[in-house]
Amino acid sequence: MRRELLLEKIETYKAIMPWYVLDYYQSQLAVPYRFTTLYEYLKEYKRFFDWLMDADLTQAPKIADIDLSTLEHLTKKDLEAFVLYLRERPSLNTYSTKEGLSQTTINRTLSALSSLYKYLTEEVENDQGEPYFYRNVMKKVSTKKKKETLASRAENIKQKLFLGDETLAFLDYVDKEYEQKLSNRAKSSFRKNKERDLAIIALLLASGVRLSEAVNLDLKDVNLNMMIIEVIRKGGKRDSVNVAGFAKGYLESYLAVRQRRYKAEKQDLAFFLTEYRGVPNRMDASSIEKMVGKYSEDFKIRVTPHKLRHTLATRLYDATKSQVLVSHQLGHSSTQVTDLYTHIVNDEQKNALDNL
């Protein structure tokens, strides 16, 4: 989502929230939380407060009037009823056959509520230096996590990775073959954005940065001489990320057309731009997800930008056998999350042996 639109949506949610949620929001800006995270949390709070009113657990006529005592005196049974509601409510997605929300979505909702409750019961200080209240009912609510071994997860993921020669083959396909299947009208749109789209895909495959990190790149953050980019990692930390050399040509080709094709002026700082009616804007995450999905589906299998991150990590581990190096490249503080790539590479080695 474009930053300007994201901030606009955040303000819309803030306008209907109780004062203590606004306090929480302001506090989290200092952490700092990403605006995308805060936006998702505000959406979850609206979902929760709407349910409180529908379930007659508050007499407030509107969300902004729900007082602190309502949250303070909610019971474990109340929260379990909310979880049951989420699990069984009709899906808003008309294309889905599921009756309720996924466990992943439910966990995200509970995570947002846990963060709010922790703030209200531990972090905030009133005039007497005490939290608003002490009883944190969220500590009594358990979340159900998907059980899956690393080996099982590796098996599921590796089918959606572009390993070995497929990394460059994917880029080559978008560059030289994709448009052959398009109508003349579709070709015109494809050619306008071809260099940009290739640059985005190449950067994701060559650096392993997160989608949000690619979206938030500015021109000043990209050093093609050193093949290093500066990104803001989770938690607000700046990091320098090395980029594999095969991406350089694609990035240079995009920069050669960026100003002219997207009507970019000096004040347009975003690295990846889109243009509508002569106005350039930062390309948003949703557009990049759709773009990657479209090209990858035509090439082999529909994947997300995060699978391109997994692709880079797996290839890097295969080349170096260093979990430390991979974790640094991905911006992780621990090597634990890179265990997945050892399983994928070990499976690939086993398959190679079986073919001898």
Swiss-Prot record:
The UniProt record lists the keyword Cell cycle: yes
Active site: 210, 234, 306, 309, 332, 341 (o-(3'-phospho-dna)-tyrosine intermediate)
Coiled-coil annotated residue ranges, if any: none
Location in the cell: Cytoplasm
Domain Core-binding (CB), residue spans: 16-121
Regulation of its activity: FtsK is required for recombination.
CDD domains xref list: DNA_BRE_C
Superkingdom of the organism of origin: Bacteria
InterPro entries: CB, DNA_brk_join_enz, Integrase-like_cat_sf, Integrase_catalytic, Integrase_recombinase_N, Integrase_SAM-like_N, Recomb_XerS, Tyrosine_recombinase_XerCD
Keywords: Cell cycle, Cell division, Chromosome partition, Cytoplasm, DNA integration, DNA recombination, DNA-binding
Cellular-component GO terms for this entry: cytoplasm
Molecular function terms from GO: DNA binding; tyrosine-based site-specific recombinase activity
Family matches, as SUPFAM superfamilies: DNA breaking-rejoining enzymes
Domain Tyr recombinase: from-to ranges: 169-354
Keyword Transmembrane helix: no
GO biological process, one term: DNA recombination
Entries under PANTHER family matching the protein: PHAGE INTEGRASE-RELATED (PTHR30349), TYROSINE RECOMBINASE XERC (PTHR30349:SF77)
Function: Site-specific tyrosine recombinase, which acts by catalyzing the cutting and rejoining of the recombining DNA molecules. Essential to convert dimers of the bacterial chromosome into monomers to permit their segregation at cell division.
Similarity comment: family membership: Belongs to the 'phage' integrase family. XerS subfamily.
Name of this protein: Tyrosine recombinase XerS
Provenance organism: Streptococcus pyogenes serotype M49 (strain NZ131)
Higher taxonomy: Bacteria, Bacillati, Bacillota, Bacilli, Lactobacillales
